[in-house]
Amino acid sequence: MKLTQLILEKRNKPKLVVMAGGSGTGKSYLLNQLDLGSLHQVNPDKYVEDPNSPAYNKLSPGVALANKEAEALADDKTSFVWDTTASNPDKIKLFLNKGYDVYMVMVYTHPVIAYLSNAKRKRQIPATAVFSTWRNVYDLIDKYNKMLKGNLSIFVNTRGGEFDKYVKEFNTAAKNGAAGISDYLENLNKKEKIGGSSFRDPYKMSDQEEQEFYNAVKNIDYDVNDYSEDRALKKYFTDWYRKKGEGPGDDKMKQRLASHRSGKERDQVRHKQALDDIADMLFDPLFQAKLLHSTPAEIDKKVQKFLS
């Protein structure tokens, strides 16, 4: 194959710019400083914030619809910008396999800045998701750099020092691993009156279903004030009731409760591991050395060259 043909094929390849990073890192802030307005933009927020969307105020369905939109664009070989956590490298590899040139702009911020920024947003994801995503994304820096053959820029977002006090406190707590971080966050939540998630909607039941449910749980020892426990039982009961016209009975309800609690315990173990990993990463000089900051102007220059 002639060199000119190779050059033409490369120029005709569709381009994907990935804005990577977890919730509260400032991806939108950086994107607004890059000259990418001519490219189609894929963002789960479009679906989550639209009252007419089936994913309105539902994070996971919003992400699923955004992923579906991105895959449809790939089928048409359309160049676009994708706002995503990038916590799953297989999804990025999918576009490489479809013939895309990919450039990743990874927005990094300290975990407590991400946590506090998320808490100030109108739409807040659970704290466990903030920290697990933080760990998962930034643990992939080397992998992405290799996969994309150096087409990776990192923007270290310090928010102008606004959160320096909290960064120092968090780092001190992190010296005691997950336990230290958990204690710090508990106190921080009380002090700042934050925590929780805006995606926690009450489970919708008809009046009759609700009456039948409360009759069915009279002998079930569960925590009605525990959102996830209450929702899990209501969903299980309602699905069964709508299908069979009656409740599942005490034994099955108790089994569902036990299953939910076991899953919650596993989630707590995973969350503790994520916090331990974060503590290790913060004090790991090899990890810190990977955070090679580029300014918005420097990133834009590299991205424009990539797109040309």
Region spans (language model):
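Glycine-rich phosphate-binding loop used to anchor ATP phosphates in small-molecule kinases
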Residues: 62-100
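Phosphate-binding P-loop
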Residues: 10-13, 73
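Conserved substrate/cofactor phosphate-moiety recognition/catalytic segment
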Residues: 29-78
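Conserved GTP-binding G-domain of TRAFAC-class P-loop NTPases and closely related GTPase folds
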Residues: 116-224, 282, 286
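The conserved Walker
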Residues: 22-23
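Conserved glycine(s) of the Walker
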Residues: 26
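Conserved phosphate-donor/acceptor-positioning beta-strand/loop module used by diverse small-molecule
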Residues: 100-115
